[in-house]
Swiss-Prot record:
Record PTM Leucine amide, positions in chain: L98
Main subcellular localisation: secreted
SUPFAM superfamilies: omega toxin-like
Compartment(s) where it occurs, according to its Swiss-Prot or TrEMBL record: Secreted
Organism classification: Eukaryota, Metazoa, Ecdysozoa, Arthropoda, Chelicerata
Disulfide bonds, paired cysteine numbers: C61-C75, C68-C81, C74-C86
Prosegment residue ranges: 24-56, 100-102
Domain comment quoted from the record: The presence of a 'disulfide through disulfide knot' structurally defines this protein as a knottin.
Tissue: Expressed by the venom gland.
Protein's recorded name: Omega-hexatoxin-Hi2b
Pfam family, one: Toxin_23
Function per UniProt: Potent inhibitor of insect, but not mammalian, voltage-gated calcium channels (Cav).
Organism in which the protein naturally occurs: Hadronyche infensa
Signal sequence residues: 1-23
Amino acid sequence: MKFSKLSLTLALILTQAIFVLCGKINEDFMENGLESHALHDEIRKPIDTEKADAERGVVDCVLNTLGCSSDKDCCGMTPSCTLGICAPSVGGLVGGLLGRAL
């Protein structure tokens, strides 16, 4: 294949531009380390204690409740208590089969 002088020149310029860009990114990383990245920002964010307490409450509820006697015993995770088991309400053919099985 024959390439024109213009296409070779453009390819060379583009390659050099990519190397310069990668060099700038690498230089920034070498100077600042992880501090310049989004991962570092996420690690440094404070923990939302209200959300953690709510999650802990749900986990405690699930671990303390082996069976259910009413919908309230399902910890709000599934809508219905069926035959002592917290089961989601599923419609259609699958729901009918699950309903008969439970």
